[in-house]
A protein has these predicted regions:
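Short loop/turn motifs that initiate or flank beta-strands
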Residues: 1-168
């Protein structure tokens, strides 16, 4: 398995599970494989790999069926900044998505919740109120997840202005 990266390429380290080996023998694959689509899905048939020795001789084995791989959703991060305003609500408009694949873009909407309303750096944001939608550059929301990502907001101090008057003496 590997995380979504907008390509159909599967690298040898992405294939990690083998069944039917004898005793404690292990195998690996060599080369670079490919799948029919770059999008998130399970059990893609992979072409282009050959069996390679591990702690077992690959010449003692044949591939029975297909080599398969899963492409899992890419984990999105979010960063943003705004002035302290007495609220923990965080508008999508102050946040930017990070860890997008290639030149893909997504549309972010909704409202998140900051861990605090006061000034501070790297304030954690609960993203349950946000949603993503398909964007430009081939960005499909179904290829991404917020789960496991870092979602932070820098809250700057609000400017305070002091004015006064005094009587002429």
């Amino acid at each position: 398995s590997r995380q979504y990266d907008a390509t159909t390429t599967i690298n040898a380290p992405d294939i990690t599970t083998f069944s039917g080996t004898v005793g404690t023998e292990t195998l690996s694959v060599s080369g670079t494989g490919s799948v029919s689509s770059a999008n998130v899905a399970n059990n893609y048939t992979v072409s282009g790999f050959t069996l390679a020795d591990g702690i077992g001789a690959s010449s003692n084995y044949i591939v029975n069926g297909n080599i398969t791989a899963n492409i899992t959703p890419r984990v999105l991060g979010m960063t943003g900044a705004r002035a302290a305003n007495g609220s923990t609500s965080v508008a999508a408009s102050v946040m930017s998505l990070t860890n997008l694949a290639g030149s893909e873009a997504l549309t972010l909407s909704g409202t998140g919740t900051a861990a605090q309303s006061t000034a501070g750096n790297d304030v954690s944001v609960n993203v349950s109120g946000f949603s993503i939608a398909n964007g430009s550059g081939g960005g499909l929301a179904s290829n991404y997840t917020f789960s496991g990502g870092t979602h932070i907001l820098d809250i700057t101090a609000t400017q305070a202005y002091i004015t006064g008057t005094r009587a002429y003496d």
